[in-house]
From Swiss-Prot:
This is Zinc transport protein ZntB. The lineage of its organism: Bacteria, Pseudomonadati, Pseudomonadota, Gammaproteobacteria, Enterobacterales. The keyword NAD does not apply. It catalyses: Zn(2+)(out) + H(+)(out) = Zn(2+)(in) + H(+)(in). It comes from Escherichia coli O8 (strain IAI1). The gene is zntB. Disulfide bonds: none annotated.
Amino acid sequence: MEAIKGSDVNVPDAVFAWMLDGRGGVKPLENTDVIDEAHPCWLHLNYVHHESAQWLATTPLLPNNVRDALAGESTRPRVSRLGEGTLITLRCINGSTDERPDQLVAMRVYMDGRLIVSTRQRKVLALDDVVSDLEEGTGPTDCGGWLVDVCDALTDHSSEFIEQLHDKIIDLEDNLLDQQIPPRGFLALLRKQLIVMRRYMAPQRDVYARLASERLPWMSDDQRRRMQDIADRLGRGLDEIDACIARTGVMADEIAQVMQENLARRTYTMSLMAMVFLPSTFLTGLFGVNLGGIPGGGWQFGFSIFCILLVVLIGGVALWLHRSKWL
């Protein structure tokens, strides 16, 4: 595999262009640098930037079908071997405060033993962990180690978000035990986030498993074992997602039952009130017809006695309902 000149991959508006020093650190790429397997280059681009897009479209270092993939529309996670290189599409939790975490960020990577080209539009928060390690001199030393560390960071962020969703479900279940119904749309959003995570993390787990099983020349056996561990860890997260989705279904039924019971209780209360006041309403309506004059209208105690009779009647009906165990 021939060496690459630094000037061939030094894109002016790149997010960064670094050379791995082989000892866990990096240094900025210069035009005079020689890129080889001992000192691979990591070129990170925002594909909507003009010069980055132009470099992706014209560089001879990338196969033709890779150019479109690195700057194309977002797809589900996948991995494809293209000659000596490998094209990988991954998804990351969205760390932007203006958007929901489940609006996942796509990152595309083309790499071989010498060159790592990664592209994105929105910031990939998980890469900050890898960048910090490289700046401190404790990062990966080669392309295989870089890929394992990136996948590990992506899985860490996904696991943290899955754990947050799990905690929300536990709180929601505790509130339901106290007959506290969540705000409208809360459970639907929670379920949607779980489904979105399930949709993208399942193929991402398959990507990790395939990378662990492929005999890529720039990955060692130890790195393949680490990649398999990452795939297994994400698989456990998927099992947690499946359990959470099932629990949200149970909670939806429980919420519907609680709301139905509340409605039935209110309807029952209104029916009892109607039964209590129905006799008094009948009498007041009957007396209020006034076709032949109001009975007792000329007697000074007529209205008082009528009110007392109504109170006694209402009390009698209430007592009968109580003894009948309707109240």
